Amino acid sequence: MSLSSIITPQFIRDTYVLGVDLTLDDGSPYPDILFSQAIESAISTIELQLGIQFDPFKVKGERHDARISNKSAFYPFTLDHRPVKSVERLSISLGNYPLVDLPVSWAVSTSAQHGQINLIPTGETIGSFLFRGGIPLLFGDIFSPYQYVPGYFSIDYTSGFTYEEGVVVIPQGETEVEITLSESLAETKPTVALEVLDAQGGGALRIKSVSTDGATVVTASAPTTGDMQISYKIHNYDPAIIKAIGLLAAISPLDIAGDLIAGAGIGSFSVGVDGLSQSIGTTASATSAGYGARIISYQKQLKDLMGMLRAKYRTVNIFSV
């Protein structure tokens, strides 16, 4: 599942454009594609500005240089796509020679959020490899005179946030169930949404605890007539990111809705019949949108929010020669 399963057209209607007349002149509602495209555009924009990947993205053969000076720091790498969910393959190669695999267990994530990993040999595998001159090699030290080898390490990994959904059961007579994720969320606290599919006499639900591996759900009273079925959605998307995307995605529908209040660029109009007249004024003009005040408010909120998110997610790259 993806972020678009959380930020849907209906989500935008129910939150950021609530109270706005979202119908065309003929009375038909705005089409879903208007909101879907606005959401997709907002997701891409926020991803680009923060330098992170929201939905799972598999990267094959990302190359990183080897420097002798990094030996004492256990070869730190900052991967190109963040946050890092898992590393599937770790290899070495000189130029275009065939890849030689290293144990994946050597890749230790030190900051999944910032894509930082280190190469730390494990005790059970270190004997199979030689460390001559600081660069790990399979056979001898033929490259040891070199202080720098470009593109020496090749890394396959998966980046992005985690979104899982499913159904769990609280057995009859019991009051608690564990939701276990298929993978650890590392540094991030998950968000959990619950829905009772079949109560079977059970009481209200609450989340007892959450962890990077899942959550514990309890019911106020045990089901009495059968097993209680519960649908869950659990993810680690930052709530501030969801808000930023919602604010940005709402601007396009608000722009269109403002034009349809009285017509594009029309600030007021009057109607007169048989000596009776009526005037209608709006906040729209040739240069201002009908919902301009809300748009300006959203833009200001977005600017403040993005400043905080950049400080949290952006990395500082330091290069040495």
Label for each model-derived stretch:
Residues A204-T212, I266-S270, T283:
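A structural signal for short, hydrophobic beta-strand segments that form beta-sheets
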Residues V271-A289:
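Protein-protein interaction interfaces in oligomeric scaffolds
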Residues K85-S93, G267-L276:
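Short polybasic amphipathic segments
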Residues D259-A264, V273:
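Acidic-leaning, charged glycine-interspersed low-complexity segments
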Residues S86-R89, Q172-G201, A244-L247, I251:
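Beta-rich globular "head" domains
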Residues M1-E165, E174, D198-T212, V218-K243, ...:
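Conserved short "hinge" loops at termini or chain/domain junctions
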